């Protein structure tokens, strides 16, 4: 388990996890607030 | 003292510059709801969707129905913006406050988020710099430390101002390596 968490924190894996979260967040924002042009 | 005087000069110039004319007709834009081309575009889009709904199979009708709702909502929202003669909304980006939501606020938000990420990375690098193997901490991320850096970096404008004011952000001239010449 310790090895697995260590694997998860290697920079490429951590980057993929983090960016998946961010991109999913953007997709969801665009689903619930489509066509945002202004605040 | 020299920095202070130049800042003062910059401030005087900024305040002395003539305010840009606020009247909107002068930039050649009208509210979209008054521009015929915008109305035509809206009617064209909406009627083509309505036509699709009439001809659609029962399975596809709700999809077009939803699309119609979204499209009419979009045109309703954009009709409050300013349009050019061609009927497309223009965003006013010169910083006038009654159009702050179009560029000023998103722009500042962008700078804030970019600065947040940069400051978080910087503080992480500074935090691991004095440990045994800083390179290792760059390839094997210390997640609790990184999360802490992200959280504290939320206040980066204040932190940056403090570091600039105290001169902490600058390296002494002697500490900057130069290539042999």
Swiss-Prot record, chain A:
Localization, UniProt: Cellular thylakoid membrane
Keywords: Membrane, Photosynthesis, Photosystem I, Thylakoid, Transmembrane, Transmembrane helix
Cellular component terms per the entry's GO annotation: photosystem I; plasma membrane-derived thylakoid membrane
Key word DNA repair present: no
Keyword Magnesium annotated: no
Organism superkingdom: Bacteria
Ranges annotated as spanning the membrane: 7-27
Membrane topology note: Single-pass membrane protein
Residue pairs linked by disulfide bridges in the UniProt entry: none
GO terms for biological process, alphabetical: photosynthesis
Family: Belongs to the PsaJ family.
Role noted for this protein: May help in the organization of the PsaE and PsaF subunits.
Record protein name field: Photosystem I reaction center subunit IX
Species assigned in the record: Synechococcus sp. (strain JA-2-3B'a(2-13)) (Cyanobacteria bacterium Yellowstone B-Prime)
Gene designation: psaJ
């Amino acid at each position: 388990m310790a090895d697995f968490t260590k694997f998860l924190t290697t920079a490429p894996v951590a980057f993929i996890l983090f960016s998946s979260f961010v991109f999913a967040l953007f997709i969801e924002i665009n689903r619930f607030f489509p066509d945002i042009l202004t605040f | 003292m020299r920095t202070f005087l130049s800042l003062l000069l910059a401030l005087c110039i900024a305040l002395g510059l003539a305010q840009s004319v606020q009247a909107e007709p002068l930039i050649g834009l009208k509210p979209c709801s008054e521009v015929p081309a915008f109305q035509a575009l809206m009617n064209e889009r909406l009627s083509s969707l309505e036509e699709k709904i009439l001809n659609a199979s029962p399975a596809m009708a709700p999809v077009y129905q939803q699309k119609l709702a979204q499209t009419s909502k979009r045109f309703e929202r954009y009709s409050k913006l300013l349009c050019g003669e061609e009927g497309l909304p223009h965003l006013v980006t010169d910083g006038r406050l009654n159009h702050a939501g179009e560029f000023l606020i998103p722009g500042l938000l962008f700078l804030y988020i970019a600065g947040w990420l940069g400051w978080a990375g910087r503080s992480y690098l500074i935090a691991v710099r004095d440990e045994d193997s800083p390179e290792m901490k760059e390839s094997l991320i210390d997640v609790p430390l990184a999360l802490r850096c992200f959280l504290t970096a939320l206040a980066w404008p204040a932190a940056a101002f403090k570091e600039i004011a105290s001169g902490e952000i600058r390296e002494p001239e002697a500490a900057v390596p130069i290539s042999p010449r």
